[in-house]
């Protein structure tokens, strides 16, 4: 329930999200880069400094690759849905001492409404994203393929690809599907002999499991939390091996994916008692 506008109903905002307007590329290399970028977009590990410690990710301001009218971060937002990208709260590079929050742009809206060119022939978007990571959020230098992937993901967001329903439920099943998708991106990065990107993907998957864990609060769900924590720990060796592009990394991830349905079944069965449930979230927020 962090960074929600005071009048936002957490039981609605945190149990539904904007549907993703993603036009997946038809070519294999393009699809690979989009998957890398999509996963990186959804992990705070991409960023640095205060943002990473607070759990901020690209998805925080751009839910579903859109915007976030309910975003309200102390010292960064003015009105809900705005952010000051030149604040020293999150950046040691771009702080200008001026309180000037601006509306968060909708990355899935018309390309003409965005200030940075998304022409694939131009490096402008990659340069802009690089500045966001390393300057605006004090992050480390991203792996080249991750930077390319983030740009590819943003370019693939299109109003023409928006589903008929503007929002979709936030569920444990969807969250676990994202974990699997992120690990498939890790395997693809290993196939590209890219240890840095593969390691980030495994780290991102572990972080996603932690996010799911947070929704299973309370003594009654201790068994489900333990299963999620074991699942995260089981990826630790794969993360280390991925960085070295060791053959064992691919094997570890493949085994993890094969084992996931068995341990996740009780987790999914307990979802109605978790904070994925609008009712449970409403009770917890009052």
Regions found by a protein language model. Give the residues of each.
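Periplasmic c-type cytochrome electron-transfer domains
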Residues: 1-286
């Amino acid at each position: 329930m962090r960074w929600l506008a005071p009048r936002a109903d957490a039981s609605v905002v945190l149990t539904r999200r904007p549907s993703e307007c993603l036009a997946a590329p038809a070519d294999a290399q393009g699809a690979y880069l989009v998957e890398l970028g999509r996963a990186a977009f959804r992990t705070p590990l991409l960023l640095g400094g205060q943002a990473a410690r607070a759990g901020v990710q690209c998805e925080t301001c751009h839910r579903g690759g859109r915007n976030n009218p309910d975003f309200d971060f102390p010292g960064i937002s003015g009105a809900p849905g705005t952010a000051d990208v030149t604040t020293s709260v999150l950046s040691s590079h771009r702080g200008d001492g001026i309180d000037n929050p601006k509306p968060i742009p909708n990355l899935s809206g018309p390309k003409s409404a965005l200030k940075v060119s998304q022409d694939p022939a131009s490096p402008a978007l990659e340069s802009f994203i690089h500045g966001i990571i390393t300057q605006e959020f004090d992050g480390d230098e991203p792996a080249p393929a991750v930077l390319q992937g983030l740009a590819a993901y943003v370019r693939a967001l299109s109003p023409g690809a928006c589903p008929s329903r503007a929002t979709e439920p936030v569920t444990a099943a969807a969250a676990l599907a994202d974990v699997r998708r992120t690990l498939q991106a890790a395997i693809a990065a290993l196939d590209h002999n890219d240890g840095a990107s593969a390691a980030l993907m495994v780290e991102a998957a572990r972080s996603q499991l932690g996010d799911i864990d947070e929704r299973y609060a309370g003594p009654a769900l201790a068994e489900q939390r333990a299963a999620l924590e074991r699942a995260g720990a089981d990826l630790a060796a794969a993360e280390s091996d991925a960085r070295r592009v060791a053959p064992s990394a691919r094997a570890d991830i493949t085994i993890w994916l094969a084992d996931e349905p068995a341990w996740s079944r009780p987790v999914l069965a307990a979802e109605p008692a978790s904070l994925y449930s609008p009712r449970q979230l409403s009770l917890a927020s009052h």
